[in-house]
Amino acid sequence: MSVETSKEPKFPILAEKSRDEVYVTDREAVEWLDSKGYGFRFREDLVVLRPFEALYLMSQNKLVLSYKSKQLLFNQYLKILEKADSKIWLRYLIYKDLRDKGYVVKDGYGFDIDFKVYEAGDYGSKPAKYLVYGVAEGTPLPVMKLYNILRHSYSLRKTLIIATVDRRSEIVYYMLSSLLLGKETRGEQ
């Protein structure tokens, strides 16, 4: 990961879809993507983007995606992704909202945690501060699952955020605390 600022590449960046991956090989684009916290850099001339990152960059007109020598439009790529991941739209909405607010957003740490989130300016110099778990409004979330996710986030010394997406695609963020599930809730003060 490059900590120095790189000059912007010529937009839109050209990317290729190969099976489940989206990759960029233009050096200038790779440098810019890496400096902004997008994707995983394998070499000087290769960044692999996660699907939600590619969707976001496509929605910002910063990325053109091709597959088998044909351009894939946003909706076409989304339909392909939805076949394999029923939560991709939810993840994309949360990712977009957080990026638009200035956060750097990366893949989560397992336990169904969708993202790890860096404060603005912290990416590359400090660890992620938050873990985000996305859920559609009205979707049941068992207390034990929530408890296990919370325990996992605390074991990583991260703050857990539950991102709830309603049917209008509006997102409400809830910060969870161990106090909610600790001794205080059982009356053992």
What does each model-identified segment do?
Residues 1-189:
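Long Lys/Arg-rich low-complexity intrinsically disordered regions in nucleic-acid-associated proteins
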